[in-house]
């Protein structure tokens, strides 16, 4: 209730402007009185002039009267000349601007105005009108909802303010009419399911600045045409001709609108450049000029995004290091010695390459053979640490004597085992008590190539032969001097003194030495 009181006060203050609107409506009716229906409207206008109470209901009656005048002009447009049409549109435009200027002063009044215009439009479209007349009426209807001040009052600072707002307003009205034509076309072909989804998208387009409005509407229109092309068999026969005319007309409207936008943008660019040329040079101004140039370039020639540029394939495999001559990798440094400076045993010898393979490697690349390059494959690494240890070798090397395996007998194998430093412990007996004497472990022979070592080996060999002969015959066991001699427990043995045993051993050893003095033993170095 309080809102209506405020609206009534505002209308009372705008009494002169409202009277001017009534006089302009009477003028239109008088100039076009030959058109059917204008006499009734003129009578309604006189009724409004007689009422001095300017209230909200009175304002709604005024808006409805103006809407009826537009309806008659649209319905009877064929009876008017081009000059009459231009004159009528000019007067109607002035009336619309005055009504909007009054409504702008009160938000509740502006809302009431929008609701009343929408209601009148729906009522008028239900009347007997052709398709072209409904399209024309939609253009007139949307002229109610726009005014030049809305575009000239954009949040921009001078001199970037839109000076020719009327041109933008015309494009805005044209786009609204095109939107309505698209909706009418979709409604007439509601049997196509794909168009129902597009119809929702068209209805959801918000009123905004004309150029973005055009972009959204144009994208949706392209989808509509694609639906008609892909579903041509679903189009009813009675709608084919009307659809063709409607599509052609909408295409022409969008083309003209786009061309006009491009012209306005080019003119505005020239105006901005002229204004900038008159200003003093500074860094901020140069940034504005650069941004403007980039913006205009992006509009005319879209720049490819970074995502559209093909990137080179990334290879995370690191290439192997280049090989040295003969394709043999350089050996790594030798491993550090242990605490006791003892190197591990040498590894087995490296496998040798086949002759064919060595010939292939020795030939130059590209002359007689072609070598395929392995890409993105790691080359096999060769561990040469054992090889270096073998080359370095231990500090004290021992000469290894070559022996013929075929000519070796059991005795030679025994001598080799003795050279291998098998530890035999000699047991000595006390001549007084006849008991073994405890000694510390005897050190093994360290150098088998010395002459005194040969005599000791012969003595051990004689002892082993005597032990074997005595154990096989069962007469006696010569195990007095060795700890590992076998004892025959089946026959009793006669105990001998140490002197007898030593004399027998010495005599037997001398016989063997005399027999072999003429030939060189196999274990003595040549």
From Swiss-Prot:
Region (Central and acidic domains): 448-484
Family matches, as InterPro entries: WH2_dom
Chain intervals with Low complexity compositional bias: 464-480
GO CC annotation terms, alphabetical: cell surface
Signal peptide: none
Protein location: Cell surface
Region spans: Disordered: 305-356, 425-452, 464-526
Primary role: Recruits and activates the Arp2/3 complex, which in turn leads to actin polymerization, promoting Rickettsia motility during infection.
Segments of skewed composition (Polar residues): 481-491, 506-526
Keywords: Actin-binding, Repeat
Subunit structure, interactors included: Homodimer.
Protein name: Arp2/3 complex-activating protein rickA
Annotated WH2 domain residues: 383-400, 410-427
Keyword Cell inner membrane: no
Keyword Translocase: no
GO MF term set: actin binding
Comp. bias regions, Pro residues: 318-352
Primary location recorded for the protein, binned into one broad class: other
Gene designation: rickA
């Amino acid at each position: 209730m309080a809102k209506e009181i405020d609206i009534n006060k505002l209308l009372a203050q705008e009494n002169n402007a409202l009277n001017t609107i009534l006089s302009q409506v009477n003028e239109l009716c008088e100039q076009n009185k030959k058109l059917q229906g204008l006499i009734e409207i003129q009578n309604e206008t006189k009724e409004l002039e007689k009422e001095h109470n300017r209230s909200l209901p009175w304002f709604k009656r005024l808006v409805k009267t103006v809407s009826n005048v537009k309806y008659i002009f649209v319905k009877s447009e064929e009876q008017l000349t081009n000059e009459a049409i231009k004159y009528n549109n000019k007067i109607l435009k002035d009336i619309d601007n005055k009504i909007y200027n009054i409504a702008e002063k009160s938000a509740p009044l502006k809302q009431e105005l929008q609701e009343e215009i929408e209601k009148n439009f729906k009522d008028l479209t239900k009347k007997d009108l052709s398709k072209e007349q409904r399209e024309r009426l939609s253009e007139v209807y949307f002229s109610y909802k726009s005014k030049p001040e809305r575009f000239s009052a954009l949040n921009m600072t001078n001199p970037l303010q839109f000076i020719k707002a009327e041109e933008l307003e015309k494009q805005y009205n044209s786009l609204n009419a095109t939107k309505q034509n698209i909706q009418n076309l979709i409604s007439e072909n509601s049997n196509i399911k794909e168009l129902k989804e597009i119809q929702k998208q068209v209805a959801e387009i918000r009123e905004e600045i004309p150029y973005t409005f055009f972009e959204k509407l144009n994208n949706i229109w392209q989808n509509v045409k694609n639906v008609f092309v892909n579903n041509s068999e679903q189009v009813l026969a009675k709608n084919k001709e009307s659809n063709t005319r409607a599509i052609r007309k909408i295409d022409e409207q969008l083309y003209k609108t786009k061309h006009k936008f491009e012209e306005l943008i080019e003119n505005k660019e020239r105006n901005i450049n002229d204004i900038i040329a008159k200003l003093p040079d500074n860094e901020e101004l140069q940034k504005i000029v650069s941004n403007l140039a980039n913006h205009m370039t992006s509009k005319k020639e879209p720049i490819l995004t970074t995502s559209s540029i093909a990137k080179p394939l990334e290879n995370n495999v690191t290439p192997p290091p280049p090989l040295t001559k003969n394709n043999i990798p350089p050996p790594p440094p030798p491993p550090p010695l242990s605490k006791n400076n003892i190197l591990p045993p040498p590894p087995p010898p490296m496998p040798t390459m086949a002759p064919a393979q060595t010939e292939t490697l020795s030939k130059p690349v590209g002359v007689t053979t072609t070598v395929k390059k392995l890409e993105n494959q790691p080359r096999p690494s060769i561990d040469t640490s054992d090889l270096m240890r073998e080359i370095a070798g231990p500090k004290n090397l021992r000469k290894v004597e070559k022996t013929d395996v075929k000519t070796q007998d059991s005795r030679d194998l025994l001598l080799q085992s003795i050279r291998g430093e098998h530890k035999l412990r000699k047991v000595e007996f006390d001549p007084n008590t006849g008991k073994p004497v405890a000694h510390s472990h005897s050190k093994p022979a360290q150098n088998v190539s010395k002459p005194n070592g040969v005599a000791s080996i012969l003595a051990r060999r004689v002892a082993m032969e005597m032990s074997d002969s005595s154990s096989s015959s069962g007469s006696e066991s010569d195990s007095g001097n060795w700890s590992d001699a076998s004892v025959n427990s089946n026959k009793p043995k006669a105990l001998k003194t140490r002197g007898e045993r030593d004399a027998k051993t010495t005599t037997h050893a001398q016989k063997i030495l005399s027999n072999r003095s003429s030939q060189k033993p196999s274990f003595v170095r040549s």
